[in-house]
Each structure stands twice: as C-alpha cells, then as structure tokens.
Amino acid sequence: MGRLGLTEILVIVGIVILLFGGKKIPELMKGLGSGIKEFKNAAKDDQPAPAKKQEEEQK
C-alpha cells in the first residue's frame, strides 16, 4: 500500500511541471545533483578517519 505506481508518479511529475515550469526544472535538478554529490563526498571523507585513529592508537 505504500508504494507509488506509474499513475501516481506521472501525476507528481505533472504537478511539478505545472508549479515550476519547464525552464526551472533543469536548474532544480542541477542543484539537487550537486547537493547529492557534496553529500557523498562528505560521507566518503568521514569514513577513513576512524581507521586512521585506530592505527595511531595501536602504535
């Protein structure tokens, strides 16, 4: 019951196009993509840090 079907997705896309217009959507997607990229980079930078601390503690 919590899944979106094809009809619901098409309705959502139609509403987004009506609200933002065709010219604004590429700008929104570009901003969303850059935000996701920054988030992934930040997450990747945080992961190696604990491994380095453990190596320093063992020395």
From Swiss-Prot:
Membrane-spanning parts: 1-21
HAMAP family found in the cross-reference section: TatA_E
Matching Pfam families: TatA_B_E
UniProt subcellular location: Cell inner membrane
Quaternary state and interactors: Forms a complex with TatC.
Keyword line: Cell inner membrane, Cell membrane, Membrane, Protein transport, Translocation, Transmembrane, Transmembrane helix, Transport
UniProt GO cellular component terms: TAT protein transport complex
NCBIfam families reported for this sequence: tatAE
Protein name: Sec-independent protein translocase protein TatA
Primary subcellular site in the record, as a coarse category: membrane
Gene: tatA
Record's function text: Part of the twin-arginine translocation (Tat) system that transports large folded proteins containing a characteristic twin-arginine motif in their signal peptide across membranes. TatA could form the protein-conducting channel of the Tat system.
Keyword Cell membrane appears in the UniProt entry: yes
InterPro entries for this protein: TatA/B/E, TatA/E
Disulfide-bonded cysteines: none
Coiled coil feature spans: none
PANTHER family (UniProt xref): SEC-INDEPENDENT PROTEIN TRANSLOCASE PROTEIN TATA
Top-rank lineage group of the source organism: Bacteria
GO molecular function terms attached to this record: protein transmembrane transporter activity
GO biological process, one term: protein transport by the Tat complex
